[in-house]
Amino acid sequence: MAITSSISRDAKSRSSILSKNVFRAETSSSNRSGRDVQRIQLHDVRRQATAQSLVPCIVDGLKSERRQSPPLLLWNDRGLSLFDAVLDSPDYYPATREWSLLHNAVRKISYSISSGDRLIELGAGNMKKTALILHTLQAQHKHVQYFACDVDRSALRRCIRELQKLFPAKSSNIKIQGLLGTYEDCAAWLKCNKSNSHTSLMWLGNSMANFTPREASEYIRSFLSSGSSMIIALDGCQDQEQIARSYEGQCNREFVLNGLPHANQLLGTNAFDINDWEFVGRWNSKLWMHESFYVARKDLALTVCGETYHFRMGETIRSIRSGKWPKMKVMEICREAGGKVMDSWMNCEETYGVYLVGKH
């Protein structure tokens, strides 16, 4: 998926289910047709159960001074389907710009990954982009262990199955596995599972920019501390009219509003009536980010986990953000993380970039 969010640190400390350094692996296979089917190797690196941890995140967001909801609410099965419609929308320029850039620069980008490396993709995302990069690595005769990391088990398994069809274990240099967990879980797993091989983390789809610049720096710092390098794709568009068309259309409206019934499902109550809320998008010039909000259509009183929260008509709950960071901003974010941009590949207009980031 293009966007994968994480769990708040406060929620983690309250509801940790697995100890920090315990990770589990599972393998499964299906052979109902009698054919030889590859096993799916999936490492459960979660330090807490995602669904259970989202409930305190919802409550924390309602209690905060600037009310917000966890972006992970958007990524249930229906949300994944709705986001596919966003990607296919003619107004959604990030998808076409990123694909064009990757297609043109994939060989150069792939040279930053050596034979024997571990390649971890943050977010079990767009198979078209992933397959392009893995096919290029295979054409360069490189042996690579690829891991897709995601919080959604079913999406992760689908991703692994599709890639195993393209890269069969018996005939391919590319070995496919999965990591089930958040970005923080992945960083913890890396620190506990150090390899003699170098690890490259791939973060495509402008997903890093779902976090504020400060949060993005913290993630980069965490991943670089394990000795890894990062390949990060980021949108640097500054045309606010184009951004609004891309992020405030009907497809995005349906995608964001889907977070409300998902919240109800997790809470076990109909606290959020989707008819009581509207979607609106706004540009935050201080953070260089587009932000999506739920806006109350009328005065509301919501009861969640035994507490009542009041909203006046027009009051908002922030849902998801998308940063638009040009190269100079990306370099600043990396410096704050103790890293540096070692190489970069830009489209002709320099409105979209892929950055190779390492420790300074």
Give the ranges of each region predicted by the language model.
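Conserved class I S-adenosyl-L-methionine
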Residues: 116-125
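Substrate-binding/catalytic lobe of Class I Rossmann-like enzymes that use SAM or dcSAM, i.e.
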Residues: 242-337
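N-terminal auxiliary segments of SAM/dcSAM-dependent transferases
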Residues: 2-73
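Class I SAM-dependent methyltransferase SAM/SAH-binding core
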Residues: 136-185
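Glycine-rich SAM-binding Motif I of class I
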Residues: 127-131
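Conserved beta-strand signature within the Rossmann-like core of class I S-adenosyl-L-methionine
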Residues: 226-239
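Class I SAM-dependent methyltransferase Rossmann-like catalytic core
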Residues: 66-111
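A short, conserved alpha-helix within the catalytic core of class I
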Residues: 209-226
